[in-house]
């Protein structure tokens, strides 16, 4: 069936196109002769740029249109940044492949200052993420944190125009766009716990499409998949979308998983942290157990405020 064309649904931002091209190249390398095409599309999250993401509401702002294309047969797979993938999928679709994780860290970017510690009181820092915002506000309550939307290039332009003294972006995105030189300080997980799945690329497809699933199998990276599975299980129990003040990061060494997570009040006034260690085979159970602990320790109330009064059960 190599005469059939595999179609990839993708957003049109430079970073999304990089990710789709990366998957295309990996597929062509694994299956010589396979024809792969990109199907660029615009999502709701790409259109609504004048409102902070947390206020736009809804889960899957960056993926729904791609999923519709797969359900209607206009595309075979969709390539996502894992941190944008909702915890639930439409019937018939699922996440079947997670590629090897790139740098999971956040990055401090500034033209004038080399680190967060160097920022004077009152400095304006841009981020669209409640997760980054709550952690930054907790350590530096003297900073002015402002919403920052748009693709990576747009955000850097706003920094360069002087609208912000510094901005926080995902290190992986900057590296993929060959903008690593803009990173002044990579932020360790201790400084800024990453988003669920940050740095990993995931591939979604129709679950009954055996041909496509077979083509995707060689791209799956088992260690990354285990780590992201633990992070996503924790996030699912917290009913987290891609715009919630939730951080989670799993590391795997010699078969043992170390999972850290936090839920924070957006203003940084409260951060609830926890961690779990256990065998990789129990990735989901560790994630759920950690989520329960966070909920019992105050995360339920924080999330109820973020979700307009609806706390995770």
Swiss-Prot record:
InterPro entries referenced in this protein's UniProt entry, alphabetically:
HemC, Porphobilin_deaminase_cofac_BS, Porphobilin_deaminase_N, Porphobilinogen_deaminase_C, Porphobilinogen_deaminase_C_sf
In this record, what's one Pfam family? Porphobil_deam
Its biological purpose: Tetrapolymerization of the monopyrrole PBG into the hydroxymethylbilane pre-uroporphyrinogen in several discrete steps.
Q: Which PROSITE patterns match?
A: PORPHOBILINOGEN_DEAM
Question: What cofactor does this one take?
Answer: dipyrromethane
Give the sites modified to S-(dipyrrolylmethanemethyl)cysteine. Answer: 242
Q: Which cysteines are joined by disulfide bonds?
A: none
* Protein name, as recorded: Porphobilinogen deaminase
Q: Which GO terms describe its biological process?
A: protoporphyrinogen IX biosynthetic process
Kindly list the residue ranges recorded as spanning the membrane: none
Report which superkingdom the organism of origin falls in.
Bacteria
List other remarks: The porphobilinogen subunits are added to the dipyrromethane group.
User: Quaternary structure?
Assistant: Monomer.
Record bears the keyword Transferase: yes
SUPFAM superfamilies this protein is in? Answer: Periplasmic binding protein-like II, Porphobilinogen deaminase (hydroxymethylbilane synthase), C-terminal domain
| The enzyme's E.C. designation | 2.5.1.61
Q: How is the cofactor bound?
A: Binds 1 dipyrromethane group covalently.
The reaction(s) annotated as catalysed by this protein in its Swiss-Prot or TrEMBL entry are: 4 porphobilinogen + H2O = hydroxymethylbilane + 4 NH4(+)
An annotated GO cellular component: cytoplasm
Q: Give the protein family.
A: Belongs to the HMBS family.
């Amino acid at each position: 069936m190599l005469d059939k064309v595999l179609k990839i649904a993708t957003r049109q931002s430079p970073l999304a196109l990089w990710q789709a091209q990366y998957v295309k190249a990996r597929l062509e390398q694994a299956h010589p002769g396979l024809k792969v095409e990109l199907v660029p599309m615009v999502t709701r999250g790409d259109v609504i740029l004048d409102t902070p993401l947390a206020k736009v509401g809804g889960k899957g702002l960056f993926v729904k249109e791609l999923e519709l294309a797969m359900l209607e047969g206009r595309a075979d797979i969709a390539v996502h940044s894992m941190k944008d993938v909702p915890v639930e999928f439409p019937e018939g679709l699922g996440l079947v492949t997670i590629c090897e994780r790139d740098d999971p860290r956040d990055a401090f970017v500034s033209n004038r200052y080399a680190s967060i510690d160097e920022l004077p009181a009152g400095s304006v820092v841009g981020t669209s993420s409640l997760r980054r915002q709550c952690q930054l506000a907790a350590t530096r309550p003297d900073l002015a944190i402002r919403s920052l939307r748009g693709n990576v290039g747009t955000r850097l332009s706003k920094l360069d125009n002087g609208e912000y003294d510094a901005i926080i972006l995902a290190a992986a995105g900057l590296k993929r766009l060959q903008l690593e030189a803009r990173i002044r300080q990579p932020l360790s997980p201790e400084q800024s716990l990453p988003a669920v799945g940050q740095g990993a690329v995931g591939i979604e497809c129709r679950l009954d499409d055996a041909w496509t699933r077979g083509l995707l199998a060689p791209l799956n990276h088992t260690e990354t998949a285990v780590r992201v599975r633990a992070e996503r299980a924790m996030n699912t129990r917290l009913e987290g979308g891609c715009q919630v003040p939730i951080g989670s990061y799993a590391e795997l060494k010699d078969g043992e998983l170390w999972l850290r997570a936090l839920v924070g009040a957006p203003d940084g006034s409260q951060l609830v942290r926890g961690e779990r260690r256990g065998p990789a085979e129990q990735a989901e159970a560790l994630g759920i157990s950690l989520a329960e602990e966070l909920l019992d320790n105050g995360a339920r109330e924080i999330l109820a405020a973020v979700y307009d009064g609806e706390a995770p059960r």
